[in-house]
Amino acid sequence: MYIVQIASECAPVIKAGGLGDVIYGLSRELELRGHCVELILPMYDCMRYDHIWGLHDAYRNLEVPWYGSSIFCDVFCGWVHGRLCFFIQPKSSDNFFNRGHYYGALDDHMRFAFFSKAAMEFLLRSNKRPDIIHCHDWQTGLVPVLLYEIYRFHGMDHQRVCYTIHNFKHQGIAGANILHATGLNNDSYYFSYDRLQDNFNPNAINFMKGGIVYSNYVNTVSPHHAWEARFSDISCGLGHTLEIHQQKFGGILNGLDYEVWNPEIDPLLASNFSVKTFGDKAKNKQALRERLLLETDDKKPMLCFIGRLDGQKGVHLVHHSIYYALSQGAQFVLLGSATEPNLSKWFWHEKQHLNDNPNVHLELGFDEELAHLIYGAADIIVVPSNYEPCGLTQMIGLRYGAVPVVRGVGGLVNTVFDRDYDQNHPPEKRNGFVFYQPDEYALETALSRAIALYKDDPVAFKTLALQGMAYDYSWNKPGLQYVEAYEYIRA
């Protein structure tokens, strides 16, 4: 198949979060399966040009209809670690992608509406006719709308669209001016509940809703999160829309890049290890203790948290887990940063308060090298999220022999299976500890079981860690599932 991914990110050249990693990992897996994959991306001024090989002109002066007139673009082509990427650069006083950042501008809706329009115009004018157009999140939610309402009448009538929702919290809610800009000119037609009208604000359109309504297949990034999106408020008002379109809606778990996250060859570890050489994991623990000036005591399990310090990640439970671990004779290492000033101030205060404690270290910020070493060193990884569409932290922890303690939400449900209580997996397939209520008591019940197993039965704890390492959370299975979805909507 010929597949074109249209997205606002692709790691490592454009990466603001996990979306970029998914775009790159999925594209590579699809190519390994023999498919032709191309990517269309914005040409941000702040992207990592050093990761692009052979950047050159692909299409000069692409004319993109806009507000009854036109904006001209140049399209550049280059290779990003083996992926063929096209970058759209508008020549306009609006400077849509020359802002010094990827997101956060007041006119983000206009910026990405234009990107969607330009991507479709590029496919049309360059005579590219992919079998599948795969779009991601609200930024490209208008692509299937434009394809169906405009471009199918210009020879693009056999393309099928897969639309993946990575985060329901950002949906692209905008006014009617977006419709006029992109050439979707019949307000009464588009401002209807079964098309683009926002489910909460009847005077606004919703990019993500448009993606759901007009695409041939819609998915989110784990099966359980797909269920949550339909039957809880986690979809932020789109639950009824998903119910209407339930026959084309599902969940496909994200994969993990096993070239980056591989304890057998990871150059950022103090000592590489595998299932067969699991004992060498302890050398990473010792190296981390020496680096962070922590006490050396092999009887103490090392717990860790790696991630953003915000409400989505269950920050109040992260904070509680630090003190609970210390009260149970364990060590705790945190690596993360808070974007909200009050949370940042709170954790800086905690860092100062705990600075002289030899069993805890709070590293506020992000350090890729340190993250790898923490994964390699940790015995237990804590993931107490309030909301987790997929989650990669627990997958990396499992890969590196760190037993996860997680809250049973989203993709955590599909990847971590409680050692004591999971009834859907035999004991030899269980790999962690799960709690469900978002409170301190529930967290403590799971943490206490994990810490007690480490202290009281080291052999059983090692067995559990090895069972986690045996799971395959690479892109292999998700890649196959996406191919099956593509083939289904092409049939």
Curated annotation (Swiss-Prot):
Q: Describe the reaction catalysed, as an equation.
A: [(1->4)-alpha-D-glucosyl](n) + ADP-alpha-D-glucose = [(1->4)-alpha-D-glucosyl](n+1) + ADP + H(+)
Q: What metabolic or biological pathway is this protein involved in? A: Glycan biosynthesis; glycogen biosynthesis
Keywords for the protein's UniProt record, in alphabetical order: Glycogen biosynthesis, Glycosyltransferase, Transferase
Binding of ADP-alpha-D-glucose occurs at K15
Q: Which domain of life is it from?
A: Bacteria
In short, the EC number is 2.4.1.21
SUPFAM superfamilies assigned = UDP-Glycosyltransferase/glycogen phosphorylase
- For this protein, the parts annotated as crossing the membrane are none
Q: What class of enzyme is it?
A: transferase
Q: Which InterPro entries match?
A: Glyco_trans_1, GS/SS, Starch_synth_cat_dom
Name of a matching Pfam family: Glycos_transf_1
Example GO BP: glycogen biosynthetic process
GO molecular function per UniProt: alpha-1,4-glucan glucosyltransferase (ADP-glucose donor) activity; alpha-1,4-glucan glucosyltransferase (UDP-glucose donor) activity
Q: What does this protein do?
A: Synthesizes alpha-1,4-glucan chains using ADP-glucose.
Read off the PANTHER family from this record: GLYCOGEN SYNTHASE 2-RELATED, PTHR46083
* Protein family: Belongs to the glycosyltransferase 1 family. Bacterial/plant glycogen synthase subfamily.
The name of this protein is Probable glycogen synthase 2
The encoding gene is glgA2
